[in-house]
Every structure is written in C-alpha cells, then in structure tokens.
C-alpha cells in the first residue's frame, strides 16, 4: 500500500447501481434514548488494515496524495486521452461491456487502461457470466478466469501482477481496495443497545416485542439444536460438499464456495444464501427447529405455494446484506450457528443515512459495500434523536427483526446461520395490505405468482382460521380510535380549549 496520510483516507461517497421460564431481561432504558454516553467522541483516527491485506494492486493512490507530490502528473488522465473527462465509474461501466480478450488487449495500451482493465469486479462478472459456479477460485478473479481457459498458464505469487504504476490517483479505485481490506473500527462495534432476553415466555415475547414491533435478541433458545454441535465446515463439506447452493447469481458446490471464501479479498464477497436448502438436503432440515416464539407462521396455509421463506446463510468475514426491509412485510428471525454478526437496525419511519428508496419502494440505492456505509455514514446518526438499534449476535443467539425495519448485517468472521421470514397474527394485516398494493408485481418477492398472492393467501387464511381477519381488523380499528382520542385530548389541552378545575 502506498504511504498515505490519515486525512487522505477519508473516503469518497460512491453511488451503487441501484415453556415458561423465569424471565431474565437486560434492557436499555428506552428504545431511542435522547442522549447516549459519550462513547464515540474519540475517533481512533485513520484506518487499520487486515493482517492479510495485500499491497495495493498496481499502486493506485487516493487523489488527495497528488497535492502532496508537487510536479506529479496523474497518469490516469494522460493515459485515458479524451476519455479522461469521464468518471472512473463510467469508464468501468464501458469496460464492463467488453469480453476478456478485449480487456486483455486494452490493458496493453496505456498505464491507465492497464489499471482499469485489471479492475477485479470486471473479471468477477466475466467469471460468473461465463463459468457460472463451475470454477475454482485462484486468488483473484482475473487469475481464476485465465486458469479456467488456460490451465497451463501460471501466475507468479498470488495471481497478481508485479507491475506497479507510479502516479495514478483515483479515489474511486483506491476506496474499492480500501473497503476490501479494512478492519471494522472498534467504535463501529462498541454500541450495544438492543434488549436481550433469556427464558421469556411466548406470551411475553408477543406482548413485549412482536406486537409493539420491537427488535430483541433472544438467548438460549437454540439449546438442543443438532446444528449447533454439528455444523462445522468439516461436517458440512463431508455431508453436502458436492451439493450446489445459491451463491449470488449462480449455483455453486459448497466445497468450491469454501475455497472461494478462504481466498476472497473484495469489498462485496459472494454470499451463500439458499432458499431451497431443506429440499436439497433434508438432513439439514432435520438438524434445526423453529424457535417456539415463531411457530405461528400463517403463510404455512399455502403449503408449497408459499413464497420463499427460509434460507441457509454462509459467508466469510465482511460478507453480509446491505440495508433492506424484509420481503412482503414479514417479520424474521435469524439464528447464528457459528460465527458472529454485527447488526444495525432503523425503525420503519427512519430511513438510514446514505440509503435512498424509490417512492414506490421497489428499488433502493445505497453505498456500494457495507464497509463503505460504515466509513461514510455511520457517524451521521451520532446526533439523531432516534439512533439505530445495534448489537453483535453470536453463535447460539437469535435476532428478531420486526416487519418494516431497515437492517444491515455484516459477518465479523466466517459465519453460518439460518433465517426465516414469517407472518403471525401480529403482522397479518400489514402483510395483506402489502400484498394488495397496485405495484405488487414489482414489490412482492419469493414467488412467480406475485399479483395473485394476496387473494390466494387471504382465501386460505379465511378457510383455515375463520373470522381471524375480521377480528384483527376490529382490534386495529379500536386501537386507532383510542389513539385518536388520546391525541385529541392533548391537542385540546395545548390549545387551552380544555381547562382543569380544582
């Protein structure tokens, strides 16, 4: 990595392409405390790179370094010629239209094109488009591609070129490397303001968390799961190593995925996230059970026609999911079997900083990577009245994510988890309302019959649980009237139309 002053490592924001037991409860004083302990006033300063971080490929430096190098000329511009007026992102978009042969030729034209044409995400796209999941990761995506088509060709070292370019300055390309090799800063992991419970009854869970739509971390409810004892890498490789699972846009054998995850050094590592794992490998389905709190799963009335609802999740440190709201207005639980995960959650009425949903909610624009969000936007919430709910969920613990909550999850180490989305009486009306939206074709997910899911689900609920929907609608209307009366009382008090008499 080139020598850089810490102030120059301030990143540039980039746009993305669009039984009843005794209750033991540890809870913060309020969900959104007005002020927190001054835990983040002191910034550690700069960034700490991962121990295994390689040197910066090709010598790309942040643009600010140019101003500390009098007389230097940015070879990025001279090497691009008339294309220098284009942003780095646009240059890469154009190069993304090229095949491997043309990228290889272009890399020989100038120093600038050499760097752009060797940008790893370009080669990642080529590997996934052409080879799908049938590849052996070879240290880098470019090396992986070449090895697949020219197995006798040998790269030196880890598959990267030894050619270093001097005086190439680019915030965009430098940050791509930085996000791939940055350790999570301690202050990003320090805040833990979620409610944690152990041995809570189902009734208390519903009244304290599910009905008020409040996140909670559940401890001890995975005791007895065979998966907790069994699901090591060795076990999974032995039992399902040759089974293909969904990894990003491709299907990939688990043993090949582990080879990839061991060697991956990128800001957005591929994530194994498979909704059909139980059908593919019934033994995995038999080694975990739905925690008692989430067994009212009303989508079950649809049988095999229900939308995708459960996933096995495997990924290396740094992998995860950027900010999103779970599909179809469902709530979710996420059980960590091995590893640990950092969670950041915002309530439905608070859009996270750096996240820009479209008016209809069909699309969300957010930073390119999770690390980039922490670098650029985490501190923005420091003075917010409603601060995010944060925690680290460890092996054997379960996170409850209420419907409508924005959440981000990043693996702090290699992790294996099970997650399920569900609809209970507490959020059934929300789900039905969501499914009947005019743009359901764009919003509903996990099924091919998006436009008819509302009618199918409602009919099945009415047949299986007669009167349930009407009862819930009546309770909702009563609660709405009570809230309106409460607001009306205080409004009249504030406008002096209501007077106390003693």
Curated annotation (Swiss-Prot):
GO BP annotations, alphabetical order: epigenetic regulation of gene expression; gibberellic acid mediated signaling pathway; gibberellin mediated signaling pathway; positive regulation of seed germination; regulation of photomorphogenesis; response to red light
PROSITE patterns named among the record's database cross-references: JMJC (PS51184)
Presence of keyword Transmembrane helix: no
Catalysed reactions listed for this entry: N(omega),N(omega)-dimethyl-L-arginyl-[protein] + 2-oxoglutarate + O2 = N(omega)-methyl-L-arginyl-[protein] + formaldehyde + succinate + CO2
Main subcellular localisation: nucleus
Binding site for Fe cation: 324, 326, 407
Tissue: Expressed in inflorescences, roots and siliques, and, at low levels, in leaves and stems.
GO cellular component, as recorded: nucleus
The protein's Enzyme Commission number: 1.14.11.-
One annotated GO molecular function: transcription cis-regulatory region binding
Region Disordered: start-end pairs: 15-45
Phenotype upon loss of function: Plants missing both JMJ20 and JMJ22 exhibit reduced seed germination efficiency during PHYB activation after red light (R)-pulse treatment due to an impaired H4R3me2 removal-dependent derepression of GA3ox1 and GA3ox2 causing lower endogenous gibberellic acid (GA) biosynthesis.
SUPFAM superfamilies: Clavaminate synthase-like (SSF51197), F-box domain (SSF81383)
InterPro entries associated with the record: Cupin_8, F-box-like_dom_sf, JmjC_dom, JMJD6_ArgDemeth/LysHydrox
Cofactor(s) the protein requires to work: Fe(2+)
Keywords linked to the UniProt accession: Gibberellin signaling pathway, Iron, Metal-binding, Nucleus, Oxidoreductase
Domain F-box positions: 80-126
Annotated ranges, domain JmjC: 279-439
Chain's role: Histone demethylase that demethylates 'Arg-3' (H4R3me) of histone H4 with a specific activity for H4R3me2. Involved in the positive regulation of gene expression. Together with JMJ20, positively regulates seed germination by promoting the removal of repressive histone arginine methylations (e.g. H4R3me2) at GA3ox1 and GA3ox2 to trigger gibberellic acid (GA) biosynthesis.
Similarity comment: family membership: Belongs to the JARID1 histone demethylase family.
Protein name, per record: Arginine-specific demethylase JMJ22
Organism: Arabidopsis thaliana (Mouse-ear cress)
Gene for this chain: JMJ22
